[in-house]
């Protein structure tokens, strides 16, 4: 129960106290960590791999650079960035959830991604890095779970180097109305059933669907990035806006 004096936010469609949301989100990802990759493939029919490849292509990351893969989970982007930056570069896979971080570390080590990757448990709202550290920051399917998104965007801006760029890959608002209706039906009826069968957890995937609907749409997120200090902010609608990639620069 939320007391009248408490600051509130949303957890899916629920209204909760701000200090409760992080723990509630943590419970979701502790629950789904072991099935996260399998569920991503099933939920998106494998298309998430194309969305992530497009993000890599838009990142401009080069050999010798330093990259932060924030809310990096099981490390799909980190693995690709590790190859791009080479031995003279560095990639930090950061996630607030220790279960997801453990899965990412084990997965990447098993496929031989070692040497230029470090793992840090970190809250996006208060990143534990010095100012002007990173050439590029990505946050992939993570921003919608952050309690105070504006604070997190300012934190990302602070740790970017001048000339650096932020890429936010996230579920968004479909731009074709018939697709939007079909997407709603899939998200709220089929997705929880898949979660129940594969991960034995319908509730976490019901939260996923609800959190997507509560996330800012394309233009709202663009404005939020601009308010945080980012310049030349643009976005690309992927799969007719089911997902959007936002990119902004620190000059």
Curated annotation (Swiss-Prot):
Q: Which UniProt keywords apply?
A: Menaquinone biosynthesis, Methyltransferase, S-adenosyl-L-methionine, Transferase, Ubiquinone biosynthesis
Q: Which residues bind S-adenosyl-L-methionine?
A: 74, 95, 123-124, 140
The record ties this protein, via Pfam families, to:
Ubie_methyltran (PF01209)
Q: Which GO terms describe its molecular function?
A: 2-methoxy-6-polyprenyl-1,4-benzoquinol methyltransferase activity; demethylmenaquinone methyltransferase activity
Catalytic activity field: a 2-demethylmenaquinol + S-adenosyl-L-methionine = a menaquinol + S-adenosyl-L-homocysteine + H(+); a 2-methoxy-6-(all-trans-polyprenyl)benzene-1,4-diol + S-adenosyl-L-methionine = a 5-methoxy-2-methyl-3-(all-trans-polyprenyl)benzene-1,4-diol + S-adenosyl-L-homocysteine + H(+)
Tell me the enzyme class.
transferase
This enzyme's EC code(s)? 2.1.1.163, 2.1.1.201
GO:BP terms for this protein?
aerobic respiration; menaquinone biosynthetic process; methylation
What pathway is it annotated to?
Answer: Quinol/quinone metabolism; menaquinone biosynthesis; menaquinol from 1,4-dihydroxy-2-naphthoate: step 2/2; Cofactor biosynthesis; ubiquinone biosynthesis
| Gene3D superfamilies with a match to the protein in the record | Vaccinia Virus protein VP39 (3.40.50.150)
Please explain the role this protein plays, according to its UniProt record.
Answer: Methyltransferase required for the conversion of demethylmenaquinol (DMKH2) to menaquinol (MKH2) and the conversion of 2-polyprenyl-6-methoxy-1,4-benzoquinol (DDMQH2) to 2-polyprenyl-3-methyl-6-methoxy-1,4-benzoquinol (DMQH2).
| Family membership | Belongs to the class I-like SAM-binding methyltransferase superfamily. MenG/UbiE family.
Q: What is this protein called?
A: Ubiquinone/menaquinone biosynthesis C-methyltransferase UbiE
């Amino acid at each position: 129960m939320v007391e009248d004096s408490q600051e509130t936010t949303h957890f899916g469609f629920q209204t909760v106290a701000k200090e409760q949301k992080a723990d509630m989100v943590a419970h979701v990802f502790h629950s789904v960590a072991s099935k996260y990759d399998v569920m991503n493939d099933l939920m998106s029919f494998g298309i998430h791999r194309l969305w992530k490849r497009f993000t890599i292509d838009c990142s401009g990351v080069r050999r010798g650079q330093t990259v932060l893969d924030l809310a990096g989970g099981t490390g799909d982007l980190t693995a690709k960035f590790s190859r791009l930056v080479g031995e003279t570069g560095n990639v930090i896979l950061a996630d607030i959830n220790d279960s997801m971080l453990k899965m990412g570390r084990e997965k990447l080590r098993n496929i031989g991604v070692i040497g230029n990757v470090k793992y840090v448990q970190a809250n996006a709202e208060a990143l534990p890095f010095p100012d002007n550290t990173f050439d590029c920051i990505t946050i992939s399917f993570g921003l919608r779970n952050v309690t105070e998104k504006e604070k997190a965007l300012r934190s990302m801006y602070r740790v970017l180097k001048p000339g650096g760029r932020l890429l936010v890959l996230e579920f968004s608002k479909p731009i074709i109305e018939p697709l939007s209706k079909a997407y709603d039906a899939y998200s709220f009826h089929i997705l929880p059933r898949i979660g129940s069968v594969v991960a034995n957890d319908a509730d976490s995937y019901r939260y996923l669907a609800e959190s997507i609907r509560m996330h800012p749409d394309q233009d709202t997120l663009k404005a939020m990035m601009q308010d945080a200090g980012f310049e030349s902010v643009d976005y690309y609608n992927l799969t007719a806006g089911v997902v959007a990639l936002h990119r902004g620069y620190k000059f």
